[in-house]
């Protein structure tokens, strides 16, 4: 089953496969599935304590890993969270969080469905 290109950019995954074969792209996707929730929790926890430095670090990590797999909406919003955090805009970060959570959930769901389909093949 092909991934939804509005959620995961197939060109990003193709680049990973070009650089390191299917094993690399599968490993990068696995790492996103494994570590992404921790990064999202880091941003949420940071906002609970109004810790913008922690929010910035979590958003930066999430942005980078999302870029690797082509989760462009996650990357874009995480970038906005990172910038707002670095500028001390706590309210803006709080406003962005629901959008980031939604985009992240869609990306995770898409990767999980793809992993299930790949395992069945």
Identify the residue ranges that each predicted region occupies.
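Two-component system phosphorelay core
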Residues: 1-121
């Amino acid at each position: 089953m092909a991934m939804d290109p509005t959620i995961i950019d197939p060109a990003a995954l193709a680049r990973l496969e070009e650089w390191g074969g299917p094993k690399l792209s599968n490993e990068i996707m696995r790492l996103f599935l494994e570590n992404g929730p921790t990064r999202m929790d880091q941003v949420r926890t940071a906002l609970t304590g109004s810790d913008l430095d922690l929010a910035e670090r979590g958003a930066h990590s999430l942005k980078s890993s999302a870029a690797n797999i082509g989760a462009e909406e996650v990357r874009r919003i995480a970038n906005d969270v990172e910038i707002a955090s670095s500028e001390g805009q706590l309210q803006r970060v709080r406003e962005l969080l629901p959008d980031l959570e939604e985009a992240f959930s869609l990306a995770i769901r898409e990767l999980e469905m793809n992993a299930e389909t790949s395992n069945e093949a």
